[in-house]
Amino acid sequence: MNHMVEQNLGPVIGISVKDSERYCSIDEKNLLEEVAQDYCDQIIERGYRNVQLIGYSLGGLIALESARQLSEKGVNVVDLTLIDSMPVNYHFNTEVVLELIFITNLGITVEDLYNNVNNQDFKDFIALAYNEEKRTIDEEGILGVVDDRYAEVRSALSELISMSTEARFSSYSKVIKRVRNEEIRIEMLLDYYRIYKHNVNGSNITPMVYFGDIRLLHPIEPMEFVFLDTEGAEIIWDDICIGNLDVVEISGNHLSCIQNDKYVKELAEVIKKPIVDYLT
């Protein structure tokens, strides 16, 4: 956000979860709509009549719903930018797999937990365990995979499944300390995860069409551990967008595009373009 503030093109407001208990008490089926309503109320109360909305990953769906609601209330959405975002179209009926995806946001992966498991094998294993008919990933599917190529992955997941939640998060906390030299208390990790899980479950929707333009920013570097289908995302957003869908490539991968300072500076330049065009 600092790079955007330095551009001096208008107020820059970041919105995050302050009260996790209240946030997680919102019904998952209504999560996006209610959160977007809250965001819209704050924007309107501050008197903003022309806005740019930016949503990253799952936040893109909140940005989309906010854009829809603001447009209906007469606010001009100058630009809607989604950064590597798409709806979640499958269910996680096992905590372990979702936890292992969650910890990538904290800079560690299953490779850091188990030396004999690599991320690509984990992703391939999950593809085998995935129940396409039910669109679910569950423990039954994981334990039902019999393939010697992924014996280490199955063993690692079986071990994690057998552990208590507290024991798993204690392990994650220790690995974060070892790999990143960062201390995150187990209680805080659990709170972060609870919000993340709520976001994922709340994003398992088919969004209504949006009557406006969308910019979809796509990181050019693959990230083997993130379950994002780039081509599928473009198809989904093209169906949603009743307007112009502009797909723009940006530097980095799903995480580094917003964490690496060099990439973030480049991203800020990409983000500002429609605002500069609007102001001139």
Language-model features: locations:
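A hydrolase-biased, glycine/serine/histidine/acidic-enriched motif that marks catalytic-domain neighborhoods
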Residues: 1-280
